[in-house]
Amino acid sequence: MRPHYEDLANNLLSLGEEVRSVVVTSPEPGAGCTSVCLGLGAALAGMGRRAAVVDCNLENPQLHHMLGQPNFVGLTSGLQGDKPLEHYGREAVPGLLLVPTGPVPPDTATRLETRRFVEAVRGLERERDVVILDAPVAGKVLESPTLSRGFDGILLVVHASRTSRSAAHGTTDDLLDAGADLLGVVLNGWV
């Protein structure tokens, strides 16, 4: 799988320096967004780039599960505190910072619509070459002006055996109709 993620990283980097923050979403849960985020981040780090993966899926956080880590601190801690978001993550491998969601209080979804969230991500952009935002499903991204249009672009992950063509096409159309900058579609689960 590593060469596929390296290809994805090269394609992303070929878009230029103006692409610093990328939202990764899918038409439905289970398409493998978190895996794609981790693979892309590791590939970027392996190429000498400084990357960060931030779990923004507050309804169904997965990053800490995949890492076998507790979810005591992370994005939500950074949104409540005054320290940079980088402080609430950990360097998994040289060049790859991983920031889980942290504790998820009931009103957390609205916190992604705050200036503090955008400032926290922009702060990471100053420290990292690419910030990868592991987002909720596309329907939730479309409900969020910050996630759908507040960053440099969106990667849509579709799963080869789980995502129907109609769901993939419909979600692509919905994102484009909403004015999102769709950078590409990643086919996951195909070998």
Name each model feature, range by range.
Residues 43:
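Rossmann-fold NAD(P)-dependent oxidoreductase module
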Residues 39-40:
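Short amphipathic alpha-helix
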Residues 110-191:
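Conserved catalytic-core segment of NTP-binding enzymes
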Residues 36:
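Hydrophobic positions on the alpha1 helix immediately C-terminal to the Walker A/P-loop
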Residues 1-18, 25-31, 46, 50-126, ...:
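P-loop/Walker-type NTP enzyme "switch/lid" segment
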